[in-house]
């Protein structure tokens, strides 16, 4: 029986009421080396199989007086642990304790200055123990308390919000009307730091401790002879998951990378060199580029491209796994025939997947999964077809934690800091039919763009950068001749969470250099344009 994560780490429970900022609360606590977990606000305390050290109630787009407003389980307030309500969370605390919440004619959106009110009582002053005077915070509310509950006192106020923060007179229950989880609240991290102290949490959630405990957990799950399969893309998540699995069970982990013909320049060879030769991972690279490209021929619809790539991937992966299983059976038979049963390995029972915590958050968020904008490429279909059990060693981690874990595992910095790359690869960055010629054009242009970003020392300042091949042609003049060639669009996004993003403001000299190189070196391209769209309204990828 594997040890539950809550028995290994002191944990804070975050109840999500549908706020766009809920995931940030989780991140802020993790950054303080405290494990925390987000669950929907409908979670009943009595149904938890673990006891949190503290509970945080998130904000919400609802009003507490709405008939359909989400309600917190009243047992939260009798669980005997500290509680912190944020925005709607404060209002929910007040609503449950006899306070009054009303719509306000002076709504607060944006920056505000809160004045801390000290009482000279340790537990009342604990949340703002290091704050003095007025502090800039971020407000985003149309409702506010018009009457505080009798058992609460004001611990912060603004000119328009007399109950900007409150504390229970005798219990460790606190509420703040502002959003300490966003960076616009200048001392928000200090507030969470104080709440962690109030909860008396051990601050031992680090990637150093995670490695040892996760390796132990993997070994308990897989057993001494079990074998694990893993589909590797060469991205950060799958590479870190593969290296962690290799550390846990060695060559009983079999990684398979499928070259689908729409990878970046020399990607398959580079990943093999790094994972197999440098890090010792048992990796097989399957060149199925012809198979993928033949099925993608004349296909323009992005969803159809995704489906073709997903289905073809499963077919190729299953065929390779059949070979590995046959090899394993032959090795087992040979070991038994030689009278060496201890050398026989077990069957393939598990499939490694690099699920991250944001994927988990999306699935359990109170407002439910967002409307599907794009079909995500994953290996879920393999589980049904191959009857494998899923093993997800990274499912508790955010992206920055995965990168930190990768560095500790010895993965080179240039790989753990790599920009995200979509599962369908360049097929969804070619806005038209996918042919080998189109792939080569985009590979070359993208390679120039990324090389110049690295040479300028900008790569780590940008969250994601790539080139897109547009389905249009433009008139140009090259070598005194009229040309009618293709157009490349450059995209670079800056973001902290990939939920919102801004375009990266390159210097004009940089853009000129990249444009000149692409139009001079990439045959068939005579024009380069820059995408300056933010997310929203645009997504980071074009398709």
UniProtKB/Swiss-Prot annotation:
MF (Gene Ontology): ATP binding; GMP synthase (glutamine-hydrolyzing) activity; GMP synthase activity
InterPro entries in alphabetical order: Class_I_gatase-like (IPR029062), GATASE (IPR017926), GMP_synth_C (IPR001674), GMP_synth_GATase (IPR004739), GMP_synthase (IPR022955), GMPS_ATP_PPase_dom (IPR025777), NAD/GMP_synthase (IPR022310), Rossmann-like_a/b/a_fold (IPR014729)
The protein's annotated pathway: Purine metabolism; GMP biosynthesis; GMP from XMP (L-Gln route): step 1/1
CC per GO annotation: cytosol
Main localization, broad class: cytoplasm
Keyword Magnesium: yes
Quaternary structure, from the entry: Homodimer.
Protein name, as recorded: GMP synthase [glutamine-hydrolyzing]
Species whose genome carries this gene: Mycosarcoma maydis (Corn smut fungus)
Lineage of the species this protein comes from: Eukaryota, Fungi, Dikarya, Basidiomycota, Ustilaginomycotina
